[in-house]
Amino acid sequence: MEVSILIVTKNRPDELEITLNKLFGLLDLSIHEVLVFIDGCKKTEVLIAKYPWVHWENSAISISASPARNKLYKKAKGKIFIGLDDDAHPLNTNFITISEKLFKELPKVGILAFEEIKGIFNSDTDVLTLKQDVLQEYLCSEFVGCGFAIRKDVYEITNGFPVWVDIYGEESCLSMEVLAKGYDILYTNRITVNHRINRAQRMQTRRNYYRFGKQLKNTTFYYLVYYPFPLFKIAKLFWHNFKKYACSDWKYFKTYFKALFAIVLFLPRLIPYRNPIDAITLEKISQLPNPKF
């Protein structure tokens, strides 16, 4: 198997169908495989019979995004793993060929971070009107989870997607481990994905509060796991979020302290995963730009 396309899904069967339908015509199933993990979602299970060419993994209860990715990626057989969100699809018909070519030409690149265009459009042609014609490629500090590629052999020398993160922040953890192993992350707009999200709707459904709490907790865990001396970083993180968010909004305030409580409770279970990165590598990583998103 040459390439594995991997998707974790929860509560978005309609979006997943769009993605699978977009992918089907772009694949050679003799050398490409699609694996989908259903994270505790009964209404998505009806798609299993409809898409027999997909390799399905199903959890009766939700285990959350990062642990689900950890389980799913262990099942993949391709030499290259391509990760997509369930509501994201590639706009390039030759996205697999481009990924293979870049990995062949650049042996020190472990991850390709694809260009992301957010929004809901009438057609892929409309999306592509927003794409820049100028080639943009540079080494960066991490990747965005809605669209990326990683070499299987590189993924397997890391701990994979962390089981100590639930959702939001798992890409930063995998990026850290890949960079610490001496591989690079290349941002490239040769491959573009349309991330079909409605920003205004997500804000109206208050997903920002949910994300705030998860990111505060998981960023704390990130520092505790990877930094030799994390307390200063954590203190700055707490103070910044207290001033900017918790003091400005009652719901942010409650979410802030709920996250702190969750951190304290989980701390004994986090200790076995501690894997400090040396200071030289951390400094090098801190000098890298973020990918465009």
Task: Set out the residue ranges of the language-model regions.
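Glycine-rich, basic loop-to-helix element that forms the pyrophosphate-binding segment
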Residues: 59-76
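Acidic donor-binding segment of Leloir-type glycosyltransferases
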Residues: 20-58
